[in-house]
Amino acid sequence: MTILKTKELKIIQRLAKVKKSIQAVSYEYSRFDAIDNKNIYEIKCREKFYDKVLIEFDKYSFNLIYAQTFNKNFLYVVEMDKIYIFNISKLYMFDYNFNWEWKDLPNQTEFNKKEKIKKLVGYIDISQAIYEINK
């Protein structure tokens, strides 16, 4: 039983056309949304287009170490005007500058929680996408 939101599940279904073995994770507290034999996937849906997508350091660091430990790639999938796929493992390997900074952001974006906390975040230029899928 997966607890992913409908939008994330639709993105996984779209990715399954290219990544045949992709599966949504079913563990409620997983720090990533999908997995296959070579990759783990963190999926984000954004209402607006950004030329630099935001990634939270806690997701970045955990998923990067998890991927390295289990010999996988960490792919960050962001839906905006298109679906953009970033290989975070490769960006790390090539010393990509994420321009990490502390920002006041909502504690959770779901459930309309307005409380803000400081989060360490970085940015990925969309030119770094390894793959794009039209909506």
Name each region found by the language model.
Residues T2, S21-A24, C45-Y92:
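Catalytic cores of nucleic-acid endonucleases
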Residues M1-E28, I83:
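Acidic-basic catalytic patches of nuclease active cores, encompassing PD-(D/E)XK
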Residues K17-K20, D36-N39, F70-K72:
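Short glycine/proline-enriched coil/turn segments at helix->beta-strand junctions
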Residues A34-F49:
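Conserved catalytic cores of phosphodiester-cleaving nucleases, focusing on short active-site segments
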Residues K20-S26, E79-K135:
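Non-catalytic C-terminal interaction segments of nucleic acid-processing enzymes
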Residues R14, K52-E56, N99:
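A short linear-motif detector with a strong N-terminal bias
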